[in-house]
Amino acid sequence: MTDQKPIRARSWLFTPATRPERFAKAAAAGADVAILDLEDAVAAKDKAQARTAALGYLADNPSDGALHALRINGLDTRAGISDLEALLGSSAVPDFLVLPKTETIGHLQILDRLLTSAGKGTRLIGLIESAHGLAAAEAIATARK
């Protein structure tokens, strides 16, 4: 995985991706990172609309004064695969991609290869939400991207 210089980010502000009118406000709120959330904050029926809004904002506002993260749905879900396909096919380049339910370093390695091949220097954050993920926590936490 790609080695990058660490970024100090102490505060993270989650914004539902169904609320595009809040994206710029979140970026200006003073948090170190504004997270556009496609996962828990979005009902299943609204996933496609939220995906379009989040990727459009990230493509049109690459440097509005804040770091941006995109939390996608888990890769074991249809919505997660759709999130990833849409990101890879867009001009959006979030500073961070947040992967929920990360259970192995392999999840991050696959994402790294896909993002790198698409020319996106996006950093990865694997969220540990299960006992299986906890067992692999050291490997996940030491992933280089």
Residue ranges of each PLM-predicted region?
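Conserved alpha/beta-domain cores
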Residues: 3-145
